[in-house]
């Protein structure tokens, strides 16, 4: 009997089972203990393979692939701390709903807690963060193949959103030629190998029912809050709100076109808040809201009903309003709850939104971080997509720009960390093969610098704008102690990114005005390659501009 051969047959059943649930992308890190899984994935023609030497980046690459493909993505890593490096991406997926299947190779039980090399307690190590956890036994022919495949099918059928962690122990030897060991065991699955359906098919319905009193509520004064959603959903939500005559407060990730732009500015005006107090119902579609003023208003508003509609299960309202939590796909929910044509009831808010927009436009000629955020819609590639980093950059775009309705926008706004942003953007590009504009801050770029290796080979133009404000300038917006701010919060690194781009053989530009930036972008969109554009700006100008605009708009 060959242990290595049966390990591979066991792994082949696991990987083949994944194909029956829509898995097409498999992300693989190097490792020895994961050899059975890696070879099974490599030999399965149904998969598109992605490799990366850094497991933390690999997890975020998978996250980006899942965001765009809307299908589960598998990740294969070896045992030990390699597994722990998947934690940040797993946490993000749990909060934003992307389906990740983490196949973590492990030592067999007799090598755990006895001083064996690269052996840690992996079973259950991610605590409550995975949506599903499956700890498989050591491969053995005493367990029928139908148990293995039905166990995988059951776990995937139960995976509504988030990550599935499958821990896979393998005993040595891990290498060797294939022979007939386990062939009969494998063949007992019969024509399943030629089929395309799961061995065990389970139906699970999570969709919310139609709200029978919707005909009553749609005649009331309402407000629509749009959070993270798809491009198609964003267009439908915008039309739905317009028909109802309800003001739409659109997040940067809503893709609604933000018909009332600069919401994070005008929500700081007391007149706007007073008018919103007249709302009898607030309908929030999508989660992960960005704007500080929006979150402050959400925390204090008291409509008769507050509804939250999102495909993700669980509570998504940090203000704990009285109302309804409806689990449904946004497009399906809109179809069940059609709008009734009514005149807009808000008068002051459209006026304030227009005045706020004019104040922002008046400053667009200055070369700076806030102005880039406002101008970003002018730099979007045609029929492309935008990836937005975290910290200050996403807040500036949310507050100062107006992105086109239905234009794909992606970000990691679940846990909102700055780790893995470049890797996630790489996954977004690979899944769509569209021209991609990504914009991050300098610390975010440094945090995931080795992800530039993932951007060496791209299928469409990829532009990475690094806004270098020399540190974490978002802390300039917070009441951090002035004497401690630079050393303990901002942490300026005084670096530039030309050498990093050169190390990975990427194009690089450092424009000093808008004309040079536009020239660099024009050239970048003509070639299927990655271009790094470093925008060096004055340290605190972006934060100060936002604060000045907030003060101006609050007094309109």
UniProtKB/Swiss-Prot annotation:
Q: Which Gene3D superfamilies match?
A: 3.40.50.970, TPP-binding domain
The record's annotation in InterPro entries points to: MenaQ_synth_MenD, MenD_middle, THDP-binding, Thiamin_PyroP_enz_TPP-bd_dom, TPP_enzyme_TPP-bd
Matching Pfam families, A to Z? TPP_enzyme_C, TPP_enzyme_M_2, TPP_enzyme_N
Q: Quaternary structure per UniProt?
A: Homodimer.
According to its UniProt entry, the protein's GO biological process terms are: menaquinone biosynthetic process
**EC class of this enzyme?**
transferase
- UniProt keyword annotation of Manganese present: yes
Transmembrane region(s): none
Q: Decide whether keyword DNA repair is in the record.
A: no
- Cofactor info, note text: Binds 1 thiamine pyrophosphate per subunit.
What is a GO molecular function of this protein?
A: manganese ion binding
**Its gene?**
menD
- Origin superkingdom: Bacteria
What cofactor is this protein dependent on?
Mg(2+); Mn(2+); thiamine diphosphate
Its biological function? Catalyzes the thiamine diphosphate-dependent decarboxylation of 2-oxoglutarate and the subsequent addition of the resulting succinic semialdehyde-thiamine pyrophosphate anion to isochorismate to yield 2-succinyl-5-enolpyruvyl-6-hydroxy-3-cyclohexene-1-carboxylate (SEPHCHC).
Q: Which family does it belong to?
A: Belongs to the TPP enzyme family. MenD subfamily.
* Alphabetical keyword list: Magnesium, Manganese, Menaquinone biosynthesis, Metal-binding, Thiamine pyrophosphate, Transferase
Q: What is this protein called?
A: 2-succinyl-5-enolpyruvyl-6-hydroxy-3-cyclohexene-1-carboxylate synthase
What EC numbers are recorded for this enzyme? 2.2.1.9
| Pathway(s) it belongs to | Quinol/quinone metabolism; 1,4-dihydroxy-2-naphthoate biosynthesis; 1,4-dihydroxy-2-naphthoate from chorismate: step 2/7; Quinol/quinone metabolism; menaquinone biosynthesis
Catalytic reaction annotation: isochorismate + 2-oxoglutarate + H(+) = 5-enolpyruvoyl-6-hydroxy-2-succinyl-cyclohex-3-ene-1-carboxylate + CO2
């Amino acid at each position: 009997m060959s242990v290595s051969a049966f390990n591979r047959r066991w792994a082949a059943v696991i990987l083949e089972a994944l194909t029956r649930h829509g898995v097409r992308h498999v992300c693989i890190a190097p490792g020895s203990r994961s050899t059975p899984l890696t070879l099974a994935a490599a030999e399965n023609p149904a998969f598109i393979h992605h490799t990366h030497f850094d497991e933390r980046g690999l997890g975020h690459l998978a996250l980006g692939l899942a965001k765009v493909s809307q299908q589960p993505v598998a990740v294969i890593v070896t045992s030990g701390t390699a597994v722990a490096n998947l934690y940040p991406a797993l946490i993000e997926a749990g909060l934003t709903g992307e389906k990740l299947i983490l196949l973590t190779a492990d030592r067999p039980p007799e090598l755990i807690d006895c001083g064996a090399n690269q052996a840690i307690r992996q079973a259950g190590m991610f605590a409550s963060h995975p949506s599903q956890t499956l700890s498989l036994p050591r491969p053995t022919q005493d367990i029928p193949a139908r148990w293995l495949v039905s166990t995988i099918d059951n776990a995937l059928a139960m995976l509504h959103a988030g990550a599935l962690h499958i821990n896979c122990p393998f005993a040595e030897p891990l290498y060797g030629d294939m022979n007939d060991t386990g062939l009969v065991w494998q063949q007992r699955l019969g024509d399943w190998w030629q089929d395309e359906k799961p061995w065990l098919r389970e139906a699970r319905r999570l969709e919310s029912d139609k709200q029978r009193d919707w005909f009553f509520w749609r005649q009331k004064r309402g407000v629509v809050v749009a959070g993270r959603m798809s491009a198609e959903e964003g267009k439908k939500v915008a039309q739905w709100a317009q028909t109802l005559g309800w003001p739409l407060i659109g997040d940067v990730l809503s893709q609604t076109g933000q018909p009332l732009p600069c919401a994070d500015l005008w929500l700081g005006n007391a007149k706007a808040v007073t008018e919103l107090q007249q709302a009898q119902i607030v309908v929030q579609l999508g989660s992960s809201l960005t704007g500080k003023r929006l979150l402050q208003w959400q925390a204090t508003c008291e409509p008769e009903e507050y509804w939250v509609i999102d495909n993700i299960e669980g509570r998504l309202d940090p203000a704990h309003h009285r109302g309804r939590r409806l689990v449904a796909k946004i497009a399906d929910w809109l179809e069940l709850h059609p709008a009734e044509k009514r005149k807009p009831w808000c008068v002051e808010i459209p006026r304030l939104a227009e005045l706020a927009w004019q104040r922002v436009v008046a400053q667009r000629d200055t070369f700076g971080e806030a102005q880039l955020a406002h101008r970003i819609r002018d730099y979007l590639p045609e029929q492309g997509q935008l990836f937005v980093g975290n910290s200050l950059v996403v807040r500036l775009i949310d507050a100062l720009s107006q992105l086109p309705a239905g234009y794909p926008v992606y970000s990691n706004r679940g846990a909102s960390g700055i780790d893995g942003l470049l890797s996630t953007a790489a996954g977004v590009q690979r899944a769509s093969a569209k021209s991609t504009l990504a914009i991050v801050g300098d610390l975010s770029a440094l945090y995931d610098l080795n992800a530039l290796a993932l951007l060496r080979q791209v299928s469409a133009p990829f532009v990475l704008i690094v806004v270098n404000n020399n540190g974490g300038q978002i802390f300039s917006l917070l009441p951090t102690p002035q004497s401690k701010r630079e050393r303990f919060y901002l942490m300026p690194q005084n670096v530039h990114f030309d050498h990093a781009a050169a190390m990975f053989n990427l194009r690089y530009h450092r424009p000093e005005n808008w004309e040079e930036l536009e020239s660099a972008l024009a050239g970048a969109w003509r070639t299927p390659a990655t271009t790094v554009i470093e925008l060096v700006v004055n340290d605190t100008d972006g934060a100060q501009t936002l604060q000045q605009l907030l003060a101006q708009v609050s007094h309109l």
